[in-house]
Amino acid sequence: MSRIGKMPIRLADQAQVEVKENMINVTGPKGALSQALVDEVIVSVADGAVTVQRKDDSKRARAMHGLYRMLVSNMVEGVTKGFTRKLEMSGVGYRAELKGNLLALTLGYSHMIYFQPPAEIKIEVPDPTTVLVSGIDKALVGQIAAKIRSFRKPEPYRGKGIKYEGEVIRRKEGKAAGK
């Protein structure tokens, strides 16, 4: 039995889970999410908890068991609390600003980079070197944060670029001067 898959998911008071055929719908105060289910797993709701079970013991069913348990868990957490990724910029002149819903980034290129997030993602800029990406879908929040980070990844010599909060950049030593 999957160690992760066998754990029940406790539902918060505000979250409601509905299972219909091969779809699971989770609704909460922050919004609603739905996920298609594969044939190898069975999702059931009882006593304020969601359980995920597998139909057989095939290798694929075992893999899907843990995966779908975490997907449902992330959906429940997303519609109740939400998810946030914090990006930090370091480098001379590197800054971000919000123009309406458009994120404008100055990253040392000859031009500014404009990024339009999807409607379900909220972007905040508390200060010019910090960007907060938040939403109810964990995968989408991570994907958008990775997209913003990809505009100027941290470089190993000076550490300039966009990095996640708490990310450790492996630094390299520059070329040694001649003898």
UniProtKB/Swiss-Prot annotation:
A biological process (GO) of this protein is: cytoplasmic translation
Q: Which UniProt keywords apply?
A: Ribonucleoprotein, Ribosomal protein, RNA-binding, rRNA-binding
- Which molecular function terms from Gene Ontology are attached? rRNA binding; structural constituent of ribosome
* GO cellular component assignments: cytosolic large ribosomal subunit
Membrane-spanning residues:
none
Q: Which InterPro entries match?
A: Ribosomal_uL6-like (IPR000702), Ribosomal_uL6-like_a/b-dom_sf (IPR036789), Ribosomal_uL6_a/b-dom (IPR020040), Ribosomal_uL6_bac-type (IPR019906)
The family note in this entry says:
Belongs to the universal ribosomal protein uL6 family.
Q: Which PANTHER family match?
A: 60S/50S RIBOSOMAL PROTEIN L6/L9 (PTHR11655), LARGE RIBOSOMAL SUBUNIT PROTEIN UL6M (PTHR11655:SF14)
Subunit (UniProt): Part of the 50S ribosomal subunit.
Relate the protein's function as given in its record.
This protein binds to the 23S rRNA, and is important in its secondary structure. It is located near the subunit interface in the base of the L7/L12 stalk, and near the tRNA binding site of the peptidyltransferase center.
In its UniProt entry, what is this protein called? Large ribosomal subunit protein uL6
Record lineage: Bacteria, Pseudomonadati, Chlorobiota, Chlorobiia, Chlorobiales
This chain is encoded by the gene named rplF
